[in-house]
Amino acid sequence: MLLKNCKILKNGKFKKVDILIKDDKIEKISENIDVTDENTIDVKDRFVTAGFIDAHVHWREPGFSKKETVYTASRAAARGGFTTVMTMPNLNPVPDSAETLNKQLEIIKNDSVIRAIPYGAITKEEYGRELSDMEDIADKVFAFTDDGRGVQSANVMYEAMLMGSKLNKAIVAHCEDNSLIRGGAMHEGKRSAELGIKGIPSICESTQIARDILLAEAANCHYHVCHISAKESVRAVREGKKNNIRVTCEVTPHHLLSCDEDIKEDNGMWKMNPPLRGREDRNALIAGVLDGTIDIIATDHAPHTMEEKIRGIEKSSFGIVGSETAFTQLYTKFVKTDIFSLEMLVKLMSENVAKIFNLPYGKLEENSFADIVVIDLEKEITINPEEFLSKGRNTPYANEKVNGIPVLTISNGKIAYIDKEEINL
């Protein structure tokens, strides 16, 4: 396959090149490649970069295919420019043993249009009491997490980190102290009081992060914090890094884009975990991205049926979708307004993910994997959930106008998504 008239970023500047793909690798990047008998695609001077890597998605299968399937989720991710994703273990069965993990791997092998690497659970059934068969499944999983739940016992988390260190696998944590949730459904603050909805305080997250950073230091383990949301959490991670503790973290697009002040009414589409916090928290997250405290952006794509999201904030399920809109929203809100550079955003969504987790992806260079996304930076669309490839329609961002639209995604050398109105084969 030959991609003609590609506009890539080289040392902060755009450069026009052609890209030759052989099998699953990039064979050559050069000006005016002339090869006969190749599938040639003219991308017409659109921006081309390494495919995005999402370290946090909920693909729901096996167990919850009413919400999403591996096939629909992978198509949605490809449409958003993602070529590699890591799938969370809150499934049925939970991938906590070789037997249960293999069920998920078989579905991924048969149905996914992009590269998908599963997480293994930290504890059996994600109950937080007994470690999963970590040694048995380590070679087949990306890392270990009980995402969806915080590991409540410090001792269990410490034992998991010791095992993670032994296996050279990261321990990835959804941080939430159950004793501090107190029946809350959104951030505890002025807005929750105005809406009459029980709130979840920021310390529910930050205290567990602080605990785990010290445990990671003791265990010499790579500790990665999921979907960081509070200013105190950013401070804890920043201090951990200053002390050379092996801590990394991610932020979601929605926590960068919005705060609790944007919740104008009791609408379940705004319910997510962790919740959107205050304006100061959002500003701290943006500052954390800019100063490198926050390493990567991950979507936390969490599809639900509409029935689960139309009950108001207190009774609706936690979670919003993000695979198809992450880059477009971030490009529109942060790159076009000169808060982030395009190069920074791309790194946050690809190269940095590969770097912190030691993956051989996230590069647009010769001999690297042919994971590529072509983006029309000028094209504008209006977000329409009814047009999503995901089964999930649960987003509060419907009708938002965005630029920077992926029109072609190539994963492992194969076309995973193509906008046939924009790209001619």
Q: Across the structure, where does each feature detected by a protein language model lie?
A:
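Histidine/acidic residue-rich metal-binding segments in metalloenzymes
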Residues: 131-297
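His/Asp/Glu-enriched, well-ordered alpha-helical/loop segment
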Residues: 194-222, 269, 290-291, 295-297, ...
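C-terminal cap of metal-dependent C-N hydrolases
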Residues: 6, 312-315, 369-425
